[in-house]
Design a protein with these regions (language model features):
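A solvent-exposed beta-alpha-beta segment
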Residues: 2, 146-188
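A conserved beta-strand element that flanks and buttresses the S-adenosyl-L-methionine
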Residues: 7-11
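Hydrophobic adenine-recognition pocket in adenosine-nucleotide-binding enzymes
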Residues: 14
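A short glycine-rich, Lys/Arg-flanked "PGG" loop and its adjoining helix->strand segment in the class I
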Residues: 22-39
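Short secondary-structure boundary/capping segments
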Residues: 23, 53-57, 175-178
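Short, glycine-/aromatic-enriched active-site segment of Class I SAM-dependent methyltransferases
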Residues: 40-63, 67-69, 74
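Conserved S-adenosyl-L-methionine
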Residues: 79-90
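Flexible, glycine-/basic-rich loop-and-beta segments that form/coincide
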Residues: 91-136, 140
Length: 188
């Protein structure tokens, strides 16, 4: 048990790994100072759909959240998203600035509302949005496999360097085997 409070707490690229995000936020609330800030950064659902970031979807990520849902989960746990910032981490992420619900931080309603409006415009709550995403990913797969086959047909050999999670997701989902790429190396 922690008997201290903290003015700054961060959770970077891990919120979607949590089996119980509500309990996590309750725990954050308990240790966050009255005037403290909790900084949460993650690939968001808007970026996944808009930028077709399928390669970030893997077994360790239990779920993905829209900003609308992050705001709601925070509110349900007596916290408040008072600002957010889009960034290019992992192809597209959002950093959320969260405080206690009654903290004196001014809420950047304009920025928050703009993100939520964009999420609503893209219909993140509708299944057809994800069916369209799937079709686009299949088209990417067809194009990439065609390019790889052309390169091989031209007598060239493809080698890979950098075996990141994203690279492995792409290789597995597109079924790119050693038939296409003979060697992949990585350096840690």
């Amino acid at each position: 048990k922690i008997n201290k409070s903290f003015k700054a707490i961060t959770a970077l690229s891990m919120f979607y790994d949590l089996p119980n995000p509500n309990q996590f936020l309750l725990d954050i609330k308990k240790i966050l100072a009255t005037d403290g800030i909790f900084i949460l950064e993650q690939v968001d659902l808007l970026s996944i759909v808009k930028e077709q970031l399928f390669d970030t979807i893997c077994h360790e990520h239990l779920e993905y959240y829209s900003s609308k849902i992050i705001i709601e989960i925070a509110k349900n746990n007596h916290l408040r998203v008072f600002d957010l910032k889009k960034n290019d981490i992992n192809g597209g992420s959002i950093t959320y600035y969260i405080c206690h619900e009654n903290a004196k931080f001014k809420t950047n309603l304009k920025k928050i509302n703009n993100i939520v409006k964009e999420e609503n415009r893209l219909k993140l709550e509708k299944i057809n949005t994800y069916k369209k995403l799937e079709k686009n990913i299949i088209q990417q797969k067809i194009k990439l496999i065609s390019l790889i086959k052309k390169i091989i047909k031209d007598g060239k050999i493809i080698h890979g360097y950098g075996a990141s999670t994203k690279g492995n997701v792409l290789l597995q989902y597109f079924k790119i085997t050693n038939k296409f790429i003979k060697y992949i190396a990585d350096r840690n």
